[in-house]
Amino acid sequence: MSRPTKFRKVDFFPKSTCFIPLGKPKCEVEEIALKIEELEAIRLKDIKELNQEECAAKMEVSRQTFQNIIDSARKKIAIALTEGNAIAIGGGNFKSKFCKFKCLDCRNTYEINCENDKHMCPSCGSNNIVCNKKTGSCENLCK
């Protein structure tokens, strides 16, 4: 029996999640799925220029796991660029300090940094809130 996949910590979510080669309709191109944690690995290593140990620590994984993640990401990006495929960013096994909350009193849904922000509804001020994602990433508020 294989070990369960450990959630990888991610601090960045892209505004754009689909990239299509110029001049090709989306329906005519093959789509490559790039996981959120793969994009985070690329961001930390290639943009932030952190070393492998720092990247692994930020994502809360081993150095070997980080290397596996970034190798997978780079291969997918290389295939998409050389073969003219679209890249769709989403999914994966990750956790984040950002979480969607729902107020049980006024039904407002909102997103906050669950590590730093106050756990009260910005609309009505109620503390009667729950995590709307139920992923465990905000720990005690996920029900």
Swiss-Prot record:
Q: Where are the transmembrane segments?
A: none
Pfam families in the cross-refs: DUF134
What InterPro entries is this protein classified in?
UPF0251
Q: Which family does it belong to?
A: Belongs to the UPF0251 family.
List the HAMAP family hit by this protein, alphabetically: UPF0251
State the name under which the record lists this protein: UPF0251 protein CA_C3166
